[in-house]
């Protein structure tokens, strides 16, 4: 399960160790332009990487690039990666990028802990339609108390907080606590494997898509602003993709 959680935390991309460097915008602009052009090529292919970018809006990406071109924030490859991730999320207007998340990251093994995710959502949002038909036995409750994927999620995410500090500060309020992240993964798993209707899953998935985009882009902007005031600092960014059904 821990290995699965680590894969989920691909959703949580870490960018670290920002080295001393002067702004090299024109070099980066060429690389970022190449990145956008490369996506155009990938959209015509059927590779694993192409699946991630099938939904990328090229015009949106070019406009996002223009917004950053007079900035002193993009100073090296780490910041460049922030741009790529943020623009990919901001400019993905369809569902392919979100489908990639579950197809490539969340594996069916998570289904083994489904009752624990149902129990967690029942405790956090008892009126959620995702658990309307869920039946959790006493035996399952006891099993979840002893060993739950929720505990693994909290353990890994708490370790991340030990490194980057409080999530609410790091993300400029986009995420208020580890519990927000755990709740997001919980809903994602129940949308993928739960027993609720397809209509309910569709509505809940749209909510998660917007939630993830808001988190990713708000956090990216937060990181960009930090680069302006503390370009020598060590920073991280977490982003992720959610599937479509």
Curated annotation (Swiss-Prot):
Phosphoserine PTM sites in chain numbering: 33, 40, 92-93, 115
Protein name in the entry: Balbiani ring A 28 kDa protein
A Pfam family recorded for this sequence: DUF5442
Disulfide bonds: none
Subcellular location per the Swiss-Prot or TrEMBL entry: Secreted
Record-level GO cellular component terms: extracellular region
Tissue specificity note: Salivary gland.
